[in-house]
Amino acid sequence: MSPSRVGRTVLVALATLIALGSAKAAVRDLSALVEPYQKASSEQALGILAAKAYMEPSRGGAEPTPQAAVSLVLLPYSAAFEADLDAVKAGLRDSADSYIRAVGAIEAVRVDYEKGLVAAGAGELVRNEATDARGLAEVTGLPAGDWLLLAWREGGHQSKDLKVRDPDAKRYSDIPTTMTYSMVTYWRSRVTVRTGETVEVSLSDRNVWMTAPRQEGGPPKPPRPQPPKKRR
């Protein structure tokens, strides 16, 4: 084997080792993050989270309207996870594409963090619940510590008529002229769970964290331009 090929082989091997080391370090970091929660669980240092979702009354003297079917997920607090969520919200108004894709981006960030917890042997720390017809939800047996609550509710389906340019309408007769979507309302809160105590969280239209559409149907994405053929 020539010296140059030996050098390339060594570089590839080093790059592989670095990548593996980085991946293991990431898992170790997450394992360190969840260790206090697992210790609290083993010591039965547990608390409860009680959530209440509602809409404020539109007129004085009326009762709040309970919000059923609000999904909740409680995850061990992570500054990195929180920063990833903030990044999605910060880019919400950058473009129409960012606005439409925000819900998918939030879900991707959440799922990635949940997978990381499972990989670190802490899948039991991913806690899910939903509010009932009274707008109430309770999560019991939470290890003491800081948690990040992410909650969301999907609204009714809406439609919007689209303007299609004449040339496109003639060329593509099957272009949809209506976009259907639903609005997703998010709440986010950092909560501290203490042993033997119940922490209460209110989810109302006054403390919404983010609102974005989930597109369900509409115009197809434009095809990617084909790269020019290389001349031989």
Outline where the language-model segments fall.
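Short beta-strand segments within Ig-like beta-sandwich modules, predominantly Fibronectin type-III
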Residues: N128-T131
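Short, surface-exposed beta-strand/beta-hairpin micro-motifs centered on an aromatic residue
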Residues: A133-G141
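Primarily secretory-pathway and cell-envelope proteins
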Residues: A25-D112, R153-R232
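Bacterial N-terminal signal peptides that target proteins for export
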Residues: M1-L11
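Bacterial N-terminal signal peptides
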Residues: L11-A19
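Extracytoplasmic
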Residues: G116
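A short tyrosine-centered beta-strand micro-motif
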Residues: G145-A151
